[in-house]
Amino acid sequence: MNTVSPAKKKVIIIGAGIAGLKAASTLHQNGIQDCLVLEARDRVGGRLQTVTGYQGRKYDIGASWHHDTLTNPLFLEEAQLSLNDGRTRFVFDDDNFIYIDEERGRVDHDKELLLEIVDNEMSKFAELEFHQHLGVSDCSFFQLVMKYLLQRRQFLTNDQIRYLPQLCRYLELWHGLDWKLLSAKDTYFGHQGRNAFALNYDSVVQRIAQSFPQNWLKLSCEVKSITREPSKNVTVNCEDGTVYNADYVIITVPQSVLNLSVQPEKNLRGRIEFQPPLKPVIQDAFDKIHFGALGKVIFEFEECCWSNESSKIVTLANSTNEFVEIVRNAENLDELDSMLEREDSQKHTSVTCWSQPLFFVNLSKSTGVASFMMLMQAPLTNHIESIREDKERLFSFFQPVLNKIMKCLDSEDVIDGMRPIENIANANKPVLRNIIVSNWTRDPYSRGAYSACFPGDDPVDMVVAMSNGQDSRIRFAGEHTIMDGAGCAYGAWESGRREATRISDLLK
């Protein structure tokens, strides 16, 4: 039996991601003393993580961009700091996309295909589908694209029917989900300005982490339970046996980890036991929101020997002329669905690098680094992260798509330079030196990337439940607790500031 008196704190913050760090920073700025940030990992930053690769190159293996830069307060703060000290903290890397098909090669800006124009119509079709009438049932993004093709086939060429669906799927790389898992209602969303590529997020994390007393931070400390006492205080129990008592608690763990608290299995890493349990409105909200698995693979080359025409390249999933025939011949949407299901069931092919779209950021153009940063979605992310240490297997999997990209960028096939082989005298040929893979689906304290919607989900329920808190003293912050900036670093940052400001006002 633990007879040690709990250490008393004003506010305890659980999680040292950007939401938790900003909450601590805001509390300190507002004059609140004696707070504590408990972090299960041995580092700060959460899903912001900068890693070092070949020749000391740095990459963000978690979030990479400041999105919505017209309205993003974290970006505007960074921009002001750059004005003050002249340091480059980001680059705007928006660009015209290069789209590559395995058979046809480049299909972007094609005078006959005009895929970008038809894709724009597809986004308008989605908007009209769900916003012209109230109560329209949700479906998967895949089903919505099929509906568009069926209704508009009279006005589409065979090649447009073949390639457009695969081009539309680049949106999978925003959400971290396959189009058959993704809510059609939630697929398209407005962007408030351009995207700025961070150089790098570790400087943002360290700046915020150093803006409050360092003795507030306790790393490698997993929280096991949170109990609301009759005295109105909150008791926090940690895995290492330490016990704390606080006036307020801000919980910033990811939605995927918080979800463990409503599962019957109690011995899961990261799971927090709540006493009393999370209130019904929070438990119910988990039924209306899910989690995506956006993963990253970094391909590091000796030097850049490819065209820097664009910083953005998407390779399209394979398509067939048989698909076009099915779309042309289907009597209605139900028949189209069943015909496509039948065709799928007859294919017993294993997953390849051409089974889904992939998004490559050509860092050579945007930052001068001879590397590609590739984004992938579930379920591919789960598979690739499970073999992340086997670099030869990774290279073998992605080699066909890398070679195709190099060909389209006026270069040669990729040479495997990861093994110490003598005499790689390959002037002006792309020599691959290293592969780095993210680990978010296998990390027990992230269990994926960020919140995402399956068909029928409604993220508003979770945001409302989280922003109202468990009660007046047990509060929540993180990207899943806010509407503006949901799924983004700045949304998490803003939610941490929101909760800390609220508590500061109550304590004054």
From Swiss-Prot:
* GO cellular component terms given for this protein: cytoplasm
Entry cofactors: FAD
Tell me how the cofactor is bound: Binds 1 FAD per subunit.
Catalytic function, reaction form: spermine + O2 + H2O = 3-aminopropanal + spermidine + H2O2; spermidine + O2 + H2O = 3-aminopropanal + putrescine + H2O2; N(1)-acetylspermine + O2 + H2O = 3-acetamidopropanal + spermidine + H2O2; N(1)-acetylspermidine + O2 + H2O = 3-acetamidopropanal + putrescine + H2O2
The protein's matches in InterPro entries, at most eight in alphabetical order, are given as: Amino_oxidase (IPR002937), FAD/NAD-bd_sf (IPR036188), Flavin_monoamine_oxidase (IPR050281)
The keyword Metal-binding is annotated on this UniProt entry: no
Keywords noted in UniProt: FAD, Flavoprotein, Oxidoreductase
Q: Name one GO biological process term.
A: pantothenate biosynthetic process
Documented EC number(s): 1.5.3.17
Top-rank taxon:
Eukaryota
Q: Among its keywords, does the record have Oxidoreductase?
A: yes
Query: What is a single molecular function from GO for this protein?
Result: polyamine oxidase activity
For the protein in the UniProt heading, the enzyme class is oxidoreductase
Q: Which Pfam families does this one have?
A: Amino_oxidase (PF01593)
Give the family per the record.
Answer: Belongs to the flavin monoamine oxidase family.
Miscellaneous comment in the UniProt entry for this protein: Present with 6960 molecules/cell in log phase SD medium.
Free-text function comment from the UniProt entry: Involved in the production of beta-alanine, a precursor of pantothenic acid. Multicopy suppressor of fenpropimorph resistance.
What is the name attached to this protein's record?
Polyamine oxidase FMS1
Q: What organism is recorded for this protein?
A: Saccharomyces cerevisiae (strain ATCC 204508 / S288c) (Baker's yeast)
